[in-house]
Amino acid sequence: MSLDIVILAAGQGTRMRSALPKVLHPVAGNSMLGHVIHSARQLSPNGIHVVIGHGADAVREQLAADDLNFVMQDKQLGTGHAVAQALPALTAETVLILYGDVPLIEVETLTRLLKLVNPQQLGLLTVTLDDPTGYGRIVRDQQNRVCAIVEHKDANDVQKAITEGNTGILAVPAKRLADWLGRLSNNNAQGEYYLTDVIAMAVNDGLIVATEQPYGAMEVQGANDRKQLSELERHYQLREARRLMAGGVTLRDPARFDVRGEVSVGRDVLIDINVILEGKVVIEDNVVIGPNCVIKDSTLRKGVIVKANSHIEGAILGEGSDAGPFARLRPGSVLGAKAHVGNFVELKNANLGEGAKVGHLTYLGDAEVGARTNIGAGTITCNYDGANKHKTTLGTDVFIGSNNSLVAPVDIFDGATTAAGSTITQNVPTEQLGVARARQRNIEGWKRPVKIRKD
């Protein structure tokens, strides 16, 4: 079965009280529309057609991709009118209609819905709610067959008592859709062309309206204001927390843990409170992450320990290595197996060999550090001359004394040592001691200044 997907994303979202288009408001680090597009892609459709209107330029700019066809709805005249704008681009046998502000819809739910569709049957996703206020009501006949959907504003008291609501998510035979959309009327309380009226037309044309339900109501919850947006955020985070715990991860407090990207986590991993995982993060078995850490676009190999208050971005931490507390690893940083980065250490585009140690209060930028090398406290690489970046290379078994400035480009070869307080501007040969500091003088008879009294 070939498939086209239409995503309705033209709404203004006035209740958000924001200049940002509603569908671009983020849930878990990705826009609501971005979540929907991600789910749509997993269905392998012929095309994904995004109907845009308010803030169209911003939507295009943020989400532009080769597999997306943006369709403009100049006037917002209802959901039926919105789908009609995409009709000329539809070529598949089945059309699935989704909504850009319903970000938590599961691929499994959509797959079940699509299985209902055939030339004589369409699929409708409904949800049963204790309070369906605001939802269109699913009207069924005496044989429990769907015969119509009545919007909440147009419903009478009997219809408002119905607890089965319309989610708006619909899968239909494409050959029928153009005819039904062409017959829509705006004779209703809103003066709009409702997509829901397609259901009654399908029934009148002899088609069966088969229904499917999501695993939970939050899966089809939209966000019209900031409160609803926060509810979606919290539901998503708890869902991700449960998924990780089911896979063998210990979370000290699932309510104080955030995922904002694609995360792969191994078994026997311990994650403390207030940890944020952003972007693409891979965490292997037996990793420990302390409290208040941010891990972004990074890989943590087996047995890594990240201590409290560390920020790691674009880095690879080798097996058995550790970082923190208060460590910052910037993009391009690599820790070899069993390497150690201590408190208040910043790395940027630095590669530490196996067993290398950078204990504290250090900055290494654009540096290559060999195995088992030890770098003393207060050391910095002077890698930028105001115009260009330069590299510092330290061999294996090097010992850098405390409070060193390594002025790049410079090489310190295997087994070399630098004295504390040195400013190293020249290469240090293998197993030699580099000393670059002024000789100390002790001045006899020196008097400490005294404070001048002011009368």
From Swiss-Prot:
EC annotation from Swiss-Prot or TrEMBL: 2.7.7.23, 2.3.1.157
Keywords: Acyltransferase, Cell shape, Cell wall biogenesis/degradation, Cytoplasm, Magnesium, Metal-binding, Multifunctional enzyme, Nucleotidyltransferase, Peptidoglycan synthesis, Repeat, Transferase
Subcellular location: Cytoplasm
Binding site for UDP-N-acetyl-alpha-D-glucosamine: 8-11, 22, 73, 78-79, 99-101, 136, 151, 166, 224, 330, 348, 363, 374
Domain of life: Bacteria
UniProt region (Pyrophosphorylase), positions on chain: 1-226
One example of a Gene Ontology biological process annotation: cell morphogenesis
InterPro entries on file: Bifunctional_GlmU, GlmU-like, GlmU_C_LbH, Hexapep, MobA-like_NTP_Trfase, Nucleotide-diphossugar_trans, Trimer_LpxA-like_sf
Ligase among keywords: no
Cellular component, GO annotation: cytoplasm; membrane
Pathway(s) served: Nucleotide-sugar biosynthesis; UDP-N-acetyl-alpha-D-glucosamine biosynthesis; N-acetyl-alpha-D-glucosamine 1-phosphate from alpha-D-glucosamine 6-phosphate (route II): step 2/2; Nucleotide-sugar biosynthesis; UDP-N-acetyl-alpha-D-glucosamine biosynthesis; UDP-N-acetyl-alpha-D-glucosamine from N-acetyl-alpha-D-glucosamine 1-phosphate: step 1/1; Bacterial outer membrane biogenesis; LPS lipid A biosynthesis
Binding site for acetyl-CoA: A377, N383, Y384, S402, A420, R437
Pfam families: Hexapep, NTP_transf_3
Free-text cofactor note: Binds 1 Mg(2+) ion per subunit.
Residues the entry annotates as binding Mg(2+): D101, N224
Entry annotated with the keyword Metal-binding: yes
Functional summary from the UniProt entry: Catalyzes the last two sequential reactions in the de novo biosynthetic pathway for UDP-N-acetylglucosamine (UDP-GlcNAc). The C-terminal domain catalyzes the transfer of acetyl group from acetyl coenzyme A to glucosamine-1-phosphate (GlcN-1-P) to produce N-acetylglucosamine-1-phosphate (GlcNAc-1-P), which is converted into UDP-GlcNAc by the transfer of uridine 5-monophosphate (from uridine 5-triphosphate), a reaction catalyzed by the N-terminal domain.
Protein family: In the N-terminal section; belongs to the N-acetylglucosamine-1-phosphate uridyltransferase family.
Record's protein name: Bifunctional protein GlmU
Gene label: glmU
